[in-house]
């Protein structure tokens, strides 16, 4: 009996950002998470911040700039060109993002960008935090069951 092991396939599988149970548990313990998504809404990267996104110190705008840094059309729509991005403390890859985003413009594009931004803020714990942080559990369950 011979075992045919393809190192390239194994390497590709490990590099494809498989979400392990330890990663899921870590996300469920984190307080401030920002999800980056594919154009179809599937989460691709969970960015973990140790501090809360706030309007008064403009950190929410800096996080938005980081979230959309590869999408100049969204940065322009949301007037984030002069904002410095705030890097996350840690990022966990959830799935591969190999899709192209549609070009957003005009009032509809602005609404879509804001909707994507407002749905990005998540929390893994159930402590009192601002209203714009939604529970992460639903997203994690969708990822694990796919």
Curated annotation (Swiss-Prot):
Induction (UniProt): Expressed in the late phase of the viral replicative cycle.
Entry keywords, A to Z: Late protein, Virion
Chief subcellular location: virion
InterPro entries: Pox_D2
Cell compartment(s), UniProt: Virion
GO CC annotation terms, alphabetical: virion component
Record carries keyword Nucleus: no
Superkingdom of origin: Viruses
Known role: Late protein which is part of a large complex required for early virion morphogenesis. This complex participates in the formation of virosomes and the incorporation of virosomal contents into nascent immature virions.
Subunit and partners: Part of a complex composed of the kinase OPG054, OPG092, OPG100, OPG114, OPG115, OPG142 and OPG157.
Family of the protein in this entry: Belongs to the orthopoxvirus OPG114 family.
Protein name as catalogued: Core protein D2
Gene: OPG114
């Amino acid at each position: 009996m011979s075992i045919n092991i393809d190192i390239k396939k194994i390497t590709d599988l490990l590099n494809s950002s498989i979400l392990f149970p330890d990663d899921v548990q870590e996300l469920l313990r984190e307080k401030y998470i920002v999800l980056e998504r594919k154009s179809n809404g599937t989460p691709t990267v969970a960015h973990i911040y140790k501090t809360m996104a706030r309007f008064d110190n403009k950190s929410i705008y800096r996080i938005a700039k980081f979230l959309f840094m590869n999408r100049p059309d969204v940065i322009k729509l949301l007037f984030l060109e002069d904002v410095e991005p705030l890097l996350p403390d840690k990022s966990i890859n959830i799935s591969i993002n190999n899709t192209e985003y549609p070009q957003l413009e005009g009032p509809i594009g602005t609404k879509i960008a804001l909707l994507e931004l407002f749905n990005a803020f998540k929390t893994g714990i159930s402590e009192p935090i601002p209203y714009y942080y939604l529970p992460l559990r639903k997203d994690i369950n969708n990822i694990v069951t796919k």
